[in-house]
Amino acid sequence: MPVPPPPAPPPPPTFALANTEKPTLNKTEQAGRNALLSDISKGKKLKKTVTNDRSAPILDKPKGAGAGGGGGGFGGGGGFGGGGGGGGGGSFGGGGPPGLGGLFQAGMPKLRSTANRDNDSGGSRPPLLPPGGRSTSAKPFSPPSGPGRFPVPSPGHRSGPPEPQRNRMPPPRPDVGSKPDSIPPPVPSTPRPIQSSPHNRGSPPVPGGPRQPSPGPTPPPFPGNRGTALGGGSIRQSPLSSSSPFSNRPPLPPTPSRALDDKPPPPPPPVGNRPSIHREAVPPPPPQNNKPPVPSTPRPSASSQAPPPPPPPSRPGPPPLPPSSSGNDETPRLPQRNLSLSSSTPPLPSPGRSGPLPPPPSERPPPPVRDPPGRSGPLPPPPPVSRNGSTSRALPATPQLPSRSGVDSPRSGPRPPLPPDRPSAGAPPPPPPSTSIRNGFQDSPCEDEWESRFYFHPISDLPPPEPYVQTTKSYPSKLARNESRSGSNRRERGAPPLPPIPR
């Protein structure tokens, strides 16, 4: 141990010397070493960084420069929406930029909506475009309707319904939320996918039918709203208002007024026809609660319109979705569930349409059972959702109506049978029963079984603890470590302090 200390001392003197020498020797070199720093401080060598913000240019290009391209691209979107969409998109070239915005909105709904508004309609109407962007589905929707209507709806959006669409802007945001379910069409197609996906899955011809009818009859825009792009429903409402010539217009005014009264609700009423409403108007549903009659009114108006009368019955199911909003507390949850279940929900509706509607009713009783084993919390609401989807898709949803009943309770007016169904279903109560049932199945049966298996021993049965004796405890391992480390380290470390003394 004594040997190591001597070598240690020499390094300290060297370090000390180095420290003392550095200032003197490096004074000349300091300039060279610090040249970069000094230059930076002076700002001579600094170059301004050039940033390429492609986000804004991209938005601008599709909107303005890419208008033609936008039309073409949107034509593709239209094709997705319907066969005639391609032609419609091409004819819509002028509005193409907003369409592009709508397509892009999946990524950045807010920015695109604002940009679309500014570029297309100017200060006041930008909101229309954003909804339009989302409801660019309107463009796809209008493609089915036809290029002529296309331009008309777009002007309508810009001119008449900007406020309603603005009001609906919030619903489009829900659409954004719903977009995850159907992102590619996110804005327009989101509602469509929701509706179309349910309808397309269950009966794609149905959506196609409404869309095709929409091109043919003047009401089609409104039917289109239901069938083609309820997501674009807000847009279509505006288009409907814009296309006031259509008989739909009178019903539309109520929707705009609703939009004015409750911005979110108006989109739901048109969208209310489809489950997409929940996605689009997840927030709106609560307003719908405020205006359940309004949603029902849209339904009557929708039903009143000739082309979709059969769809309206099927859509009554979706009205239940708005009714889902009927549960103020549950409204967001149901919409959310619809969103989460949207993909799943459409399949159920499709089966419902296909004709296993009875199974959905049968499922209803099982749902509580399934729910207890399955997802205790969410499933019960999802069953309603699935029921809503299936019911919405299938007219014979009378059994489903019970599920609706809870959902539609606010809107029971339109369908008297619903009230009895509601009492039977007791929509809000059923979830609690389901929860209780879950608790019963999961908890009560389990608890009974476990309780029967196990019981607490009385303290008398337990053996007394050993008496506690205080004793000093030595841990040799700890001592050895401390001694070896402390002794050796102290000795080794002790040497270095000596070098300072030679200084």
UniProtKB/Swiss-Prot annotation:
InterPro entries: PH-like_dom_sf (IPR011993), WAS/WASL-interacting_domain (IPR053099), WH2_dom (IPR003124). Belongs to the verprolin family. The modification Phosphothreonine is found at T345. This is WAS/WASL-interacting protein family member 1. One of its GO terms (cellular component) is actin cytoskeleton. The modification Phosphoserine is found at S142, S234, S340, S350. Recruited to PIP5K-induced vesicle surfaces in the absence of functional WASL. Binds to WAS, profilin and actin. Binds to WASL. Interacts with DBNL. Interacts with FNBP1L (via the SH3 domain). XRSGPXPPXP motif repeats lie at residues 352-361, 374-383, 410-419. The modification Asymmetric dimethylarginine is found at R33. Residues 480-494 have a biased composition (Basic and acidic residues). SMART domains: WH2. Residues 45-48 are annotated as: Binds actin. Residues 65-104 have a biased composition (Gly residues). Residues 32-49 form the WH2 domain. Residues 121-137, 238-247 have a biased composition (Low complexity). Highly expressed in peripheral blood mononuclear cells, spleen, placenta, small intestine, colon and thymus. Lower expression in ovary, heart, brain, lung, liver, skeletal muscle, kidney, pancreas, prostate and testis. GO terms for molecular function: actin binding; cytoskeletal anchor activity; profilin binding; protein folding chaperone; SH3 domain binding. Plays a role in the reorganization of the actin cytoskeleton. Contributes with NCK1 and GRB2 in the recruitment and activation of WASL. May participate in regulating the subcellular localization of WASL, resulting in the disassembly of stress fibers in favor of filopodia formation. Plays a role in the formation of cell ruffles. Plays an important role in the intracellular motility of vaccinia virus by functioning as an adapter for recruiting WASL to vaccinia virus. Residues 1-503 are annotated as: Disordered. The keyword Glycoprotein does not apply. It is found in: Cytoplasmic vesicle; Cytoplasm, Cytoskeleton; Cell projection, Ruffle. Residues 1-14, 141-154, 161-174, 182-191, 204-223, 282-298, 306-323, 346-371, 413-434 have a biased composition (Pro residues). Residues 21-31 have a biased composition (Polar residues). It is linked to Wiskott-Aldrich syndrome 2: An immunodeficiency disorder characterized by eczema, thrombocytopenia, recurrent infections, defective T-cell proliferation, and impaired natural killer cell function. Binds to WAS within the N-terminal region 170, at a site distinct from the CDC42-binding site.
